[in-house]
């Protein structure tokens, strides 16, 4: 875009799905409420055969966001980063709460999210373009 400064960053994270299954079995709703928004829980738990895969993918996406932004988790909670689905079904990122403070300097953020699952692993790659 002519006349605009932008930054393009990418983050990726890999999650062992049985780890998420174990946390879900051990901590149940407490785990879900600590990590996932109500919308994420609704989507992930709607498909019992795929719920651990979906939860693991969203965990990976949240981690990938912090890597793409280069901020780590400094003062940001898991629920401050939310994976939402557009009307098209495409996943994207919505920042809430303290995560918004990390990106104040950008006028606009464009997100791309990609998930993949293979047996016991879920991976998410997040691309963000920030316009100043």
Swiss-Prot record:
It comes from the Bacteria. Its EC number is 2.7.8.7. GO terms for cellular component: cytoplasm. It catalyses: apo-[ACP] + CoA = holo-[ACP] + adenosine 3',5'-bisphosphate + H(+). Pfam families: ACPS (PF01648). Keywords: Cytoplasm, Fatty acid biosynthesis, Fatty acid metabolism, Lipid biosynthesis, Lipid metabolism, Magnesium, Metal-binding, Transferase. Its main location: cytoplasm. Its cofactor is Mg(2+). Mg(2+) binds at residues 13, 63. InterPro entries: 4-PPantetheinyl_Trfase_dom (IPR008278), 4-PPantetheinyl_Trfase_dom_sf (IPR037143), ACPS (IPR002582), Ppantetheine-prot_Trfase_dom (IPR004568). GO terms for biological process: fatty acid biosynthetic process. It is found in: Cytoplasm. GO terms for molecular function: holo-[acyl-carrier-protein] synthase activity; magnesium ion binding. Belongs to the P-Pant transferase superfamily. AcpS family. Transfers the 4'-phosphopantetheine moiety from coenzyme A to a Ser of acyl-carrier-protein. This is Holo-[acyl-carrier-protein] synthase. It comes from Gloeobacter violaceus (strain ATCC 29082 / PCC 7421). The gene is acpS.
């Amino acid at each position: 875009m002519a006349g605009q400064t932008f930054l393009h960053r990418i983050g990726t994270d890999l999650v062992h799905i049985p780890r998420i299954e174990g946390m879900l079995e051990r901590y149940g709703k407490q785990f879900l409420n600590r990590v996932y928004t109500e919308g994420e829980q609704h989507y992930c738990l709607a498909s019992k055969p795929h719920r651990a895969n979906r939860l693991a993918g969203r965990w990976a996406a949240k981690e990938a966001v912090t890597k793409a932004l280069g901020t780590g988790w400094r003062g940001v909670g898991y629920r401050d980063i939310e994976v939402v689905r557009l009307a098209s079904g495409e996943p994207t990122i919505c920042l809430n709460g303290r995560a918004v403070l990390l990106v104040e300097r950008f006028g606009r953020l464009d997100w791309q999210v990609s998930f993949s699952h293979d047996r016991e692993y879920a991976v998410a790659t997040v691309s963000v373009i920030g316009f100043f």
